[in-house]
């Protein structure tokens, strides 16, 4: 859920896995993955279908001249903000990482696209018009060189950087932003959230010339830049865009404005995916992109078993490893000579951003779960405190109800329901489950057992379900544990074919939390939406619509608090735990800035601040062969610590 970004739909965390890696999917057909980007720039070819759409919607797609740009605008460029990359960073080398399963598609929108691998193609790779600074208030330039907010705080003007190019050499121009709205408003993409957002949140886009546009929001916003700072869509790439879009573009990789691209030759089916850095990337020397995205290549090897991946990391076959969960990797399995001898370094970095909603999502349209008393009983029967103390060894805290750590929108007093066996039994009794069977599980008068399936995929959370199962049984609830491949679990969630799923959403800092995609009834029951709980509460629907239309921050805060109360009362989302830091290990040849990372980092490599020093790699491997040691390194950075 990156602010001011083309990616506004949060990605489902099917796995919390290897560093720079999260759960992905499985490719179903051995078709071509990515067309090789040509060396020479392509000429821009008009998209006739899109142009016809513009003509059919003249109030939305406007064409004016540079003389029509208001003369009194105050243009900004973010140049007063500090940089956050390290000038000492070295460009070059190959980075070795791992993925737990194969991505279900290489599309960036449409069915199955909202998977965790997309971050490497789009979310953390593509460039927006502008982006929130990760350490300080304000925005940094991206595709836009300068921007200006109109006095009505409803229209934002952008001057596109003439240096900006797609990875295939085609310049980024105003036409790509015009096409973006056509693309996301089209039913062909089979993405209801995008259709709604790009139709309801914006009223027009104006092209003044090839490098000047204006985006008009539905109404004035407290932070209009966040809504208007979008990514472009390459119009020239989608000449074949139509009703068969999901199938036609299933394994095609669209050109990117970011530093890394994917070529067909670098997709080894079922083995690895390799990203290549563009040698002449247009933003190489821009103030806020210099000294970032440094490795020439990033190799993602398919390693389905997390313990095997850790062994590869110890051998130096992977450059880094996510040590956040499960904590046994940090506390136990890092007690190794490679750490003591300084070959592998340990890092903890506290972040400050809204906490990703992770916990139990209850499908309220399934039998039993369609009963509020059952859902409330499950909330009381979920012993997250024990999960935190045992599975997480105490270095986490209970997640608050929706919008945790998103002041002032988070609820000031409301907290997640605690584990309470007596209250769980009382709730189950109200639903008719009053007697225990011979194994202690509750049954109703018809003899039906209080039994539900808990689906999860993340090997990083493998210690959590057994604790939840054991504690729930004390309250008469049977949880049948179903662990699936990340792709299967992700697709099951998107098809709404689960009963209870243990999962979370990738998040990020933005002005205000989102509710529509998660809880509005229009997204209930439908596949490929983020309303996993199938929530459909009339009052909540009305408040969400009012919240999304609101032009007043104080009103939005009030509405947010009330919506959180309704979500909490519905008990279809049982908050799990959160950890206000990221934690990883890396071989000493993977270098990080002295500042280590940025305040809003979701994972250590998100902002591309690290680099690979191949000379240090050779030195380290030779030292290991010779038995020589270096200084032991364990960094703990608390400058952004708040909880």
Task: Go through the PLM ranges and name each one.
Residues 27-42, 46, 78, 266, ...:
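Detector for C-terminal structural segments
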Residues 161, 248-249, 281-334, 469, ...:
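Ligand-site clamp/hinge motif
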Residues 96, 173-180, 210-216, 259, ...:
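Alpha-helical secondary-structure segments
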Residues 145, 167, 216-236, 253-305, ...:
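Aromatic-rich, solvent-exposed beta-strand/loop patch
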Residues 186-187, 191, 205-207, 265-274, ...:
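Extracellular/periplasmic solute-recognition and catalytic clefts
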Residues 104, 111-116, 120-135, 230-297, ...:
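Gly/Pro-rich hinge or "lid" segments in bacterial periplasmic/extracellular proteins
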